[in-house]
A protein has these predicted regions:
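Hydrophobic transmembrane alpha-helices of multi-pass small-molecule transport proteins
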Residues: 30, 36, 53, 91-92, ...
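Transmembrane alpha-helical segments that form core, pore/gating elements
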Residues: 32-36, 89-91, 127-163
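Cytoplasmic-side transmembrane-helix entry/capping segments in multi-pass membrane proteins
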Residues: 47-56, 101-113, 131-135, 155-163
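Juxtamembrane helix-loop-helix junctions in multi-pass membrane proteins
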Residues: 3-31, 144-163
Length: 163
């Protein structure tokens, strides 16, 4: 699984080197849409949440992700910053879903943000701040989409991916 995710970053970096980021995003979604058409189903009463999820977690997230790669010299800085999606989602779930987290999780969130702050001040990454900002936006948009995913009932993975 780790290999697949790592390979996805490398292939995406190569892709945005050949195509503009928004065109690459559109091409990616066209290919996936063709593969997932059989799973495209209407889920009555849940379509607004599904469309918000597909917009934020799909189009917006991947547009910012590809912009981050296009504006970064190093893939590693983008990959690390994208890991803030989990702390963002946790913070948002506390604010909007009234979830409760304990001190260990708070400490983990602080470590995650501290690590990214340290990364940003590394000289090679400091020159790639445009990519870091786009990666932050990509992570945040995915985190917001996760809040909407929590509201879904009986929607299968491929059904959601198809949208």
């Amino acid at each position: 699984m780790n290999f697949a995710f790592g390979a996805a970053f490398i292939s995406a970096k190569v892709g945005v080197g050949e195509f503009p980021p928004f065109l690459f995003t559109a091409m990616r979604f066209l290919i996936i849409a063709l593969l997932l058409i059989p799973f495209l189903k209407i889920h009555h009463g849940q379509m607004i949440n599904i469309l918000i999820i597909s917009f934020l977690g799909g189009g917006i997230h991947f547009s910012f992700f590809y912009l981050a790669l296009d504006n970064s010299k190093y893939i590693s800085s983008v990959a690390i910053v994208l890991q803030l999606g989990v702390p963002f989602a946790t913070i948002l779930s506390v604010i909007f879903l009234n979830e409760v987290i304990r001190w260990r999780r708070v400490l983990g969130i602080l470590f995650a943000f501290s690590g990214v702050i340290i990364l940003i001040f590394e000289p090679t990454v400091f020159n790639d701040l445009g990519g870091v900002y786009y990666a932050l936006l990509a992570a945040f948009s995915m985190s917001v989409s996760l809040l909407f995913m929590k509201k879904l009932n009986d929607v299968k993975v491929f059904d959601l991916q198809a949208w």
